[in-house]
UniProtKB/Swiss-Prot annotation:
Assembly, per entry: Homodimer.
Gene giving rise to this polypeptide: pdxB
Name recorded for this polypeptide: Erythronate-4-phosphate dehydrogenase
Active-site residues annotated for this sequence: R208, E237, H254
One Pfam entry name: DUF3410
Length: 380
């Protein structure tokens, strides 16, 4: 097999070395010419895999190490008989860790008690569904809007987007980017909806940049709108709007799901799909390539405050403010310089582990145990 992989996909050799020759390119450089002699294509969301790129190529399998598939022309895949796989849920936990870090930063700035907020989660799939589980596990009030899932689960606890925007004072977006169809999500939060948000609302977008009208959001913030905003995704990536970023509390270069586990899990999942497509046995597993965590565990004093424990456990693993600082330093120079810096921050992202790998002792204190379980850490 002739395999072409995005150079930023990790451990490709560990999984695919015995399957043929492997060539690597930057994801944004993968085009029609690059696919002339390729059987298997492994990509991330930065590569548009379209009819124009694939027509006439020998590509027969496409794997994307992402949850979303809006960069894949699935209609053409079906027409051309091209097998494909995404990696659903691969980085979901990393995104949840990111959102929790943003909420802690917002609470610190606002002097707010996270337990007293009402949370609105838009999109309850792989990422949003996990976030809902964590928030409800902590005992917090959560509203969920997901029209496609509501249609499949008519007895589920769902609300309309209008009700969610009216009642929630924390909104976290986790939808795919759908430009058409029954439930389009491009500019789901457009100028009228953004302008109608309650004063003091916190908004987190770690889904796709165009789910929020970036220009409308910038105008509102420039006009003094009382919002706290955390953006990990941007319209026109890798070109992020520096003026919008300057008005966000947290601004990062599409790294919410960049946990080490998430990256390796994505490669493992497309390898599993590839093996199924070829009808061969899997030779390597995720556990074969996942290194030991740097922080083995934490011991909480049974008398500590649960809110302090929550913040400490989350930040022991990840604090998005470090990524925010690095991103802001990159928002200088001309457009080409900023675009290159955006991709460089992603390419050279430092190892970051998920909270699920953290072992926590609580001395048997029930409320602390509830926090640990809700976060998904390992209770010992």
């Amino acid at each position: 097999m002739r395999i072409l992989a995005d150079e930023n996909i990790p451990v490709v050799d560990a999984f695919f070395a015995d399957q043929g020759s492997i060539r690597r390119l930057p994801g944004r450089a993968i085009d029609r010419a690059a696919l002339a002699e390729v059987d298997v294509l492994l990509v991330r969301s930065v590569t548009e895999v379209s009819r124009a790129a694939l027509a006439g190529s020998p590509v027969r399998f496409v794997g994307t190490c992402t949850i979303g598939t809006d960069h894949l022309d699935l209609d053409y895949f079906a027409e051309a008989g091209i097998a494909w796989s995404s990696a659903p849920g691969c980085n979901a936990r990393g995104v949840v860790d990111y959102v929790l870090g943003c909420l802690l930063a917002m609470a610190e700035v606002r002097g707010a008690d996270l337990a007293e907020r009402t949370y609105g989660v838009v999109g309850a799939g792989q990422v949003g569904g996990r976030l809902v589980e964590v928030l409800r596990g902590l005992g917090w009030k959560v509203l969920v809007c997901d029209p496609p899932r509501q249609a499949r689960e008519p007895d589920g606890e769902f609300v309309s987007l209008e009700r969610l925007l009216a009642e929630a004072d924390v909104i976290s977006l986790h939808t795919p980017l759908n430009r058409d169809g029954e439930h389009p999500t491009r500019h789901l939060l457009d100028e009228p909806r953004l302008a109608a948000l309650r004063p003091g609302t916190w908004l987190v977008n770690a889904s796709r940049g165009a789910v929020v009208d970036n220009q409308a959001l910038r105008r509102l913030l420039e006009g003094g709108a009382d919002l706290e905003v955390a953006l990990d995704v941007w319209e026109g990536e890798p070109q992020a709007d520096p003026e919008l970023a300057a008005r966000c509390l947290i601004a990062t270069p599409h790294i919410a799901g960049y946990s080490l586990e998430g990256k390796l899990r994505g490669t493992a999942q497309i390898y599993q799909a590839y093996c199924a497509w070829r009808g061969i046995a899997e030779r390597v597993s995720l556990q074969d390539v996942l290194p030991e965590t740097w922080l083995a565990g934490l011991q909480l004093n049974p008398g500590c405050d649960p809110a302090w424990a929550l913040a400490t456990l989350c930040r022991a693993v990840y604090d998005p403010r470090s990524d925010d600082a690095a991103f802001r330093r990159s928002l200088t120079g001309d457009s080409a310089t900023r675009r290159a810096a955006f991709d460089a921050l992603r390419k050279h992202y430092p190892p970051r582990r998920e909270i699920t790998g953290l072992r926590v002792a609580t001395g048997g204190q029930a409320e602390l145990q509830r926090v640990v379980r809700a976060l998904g850490a390992q209770l010992v």
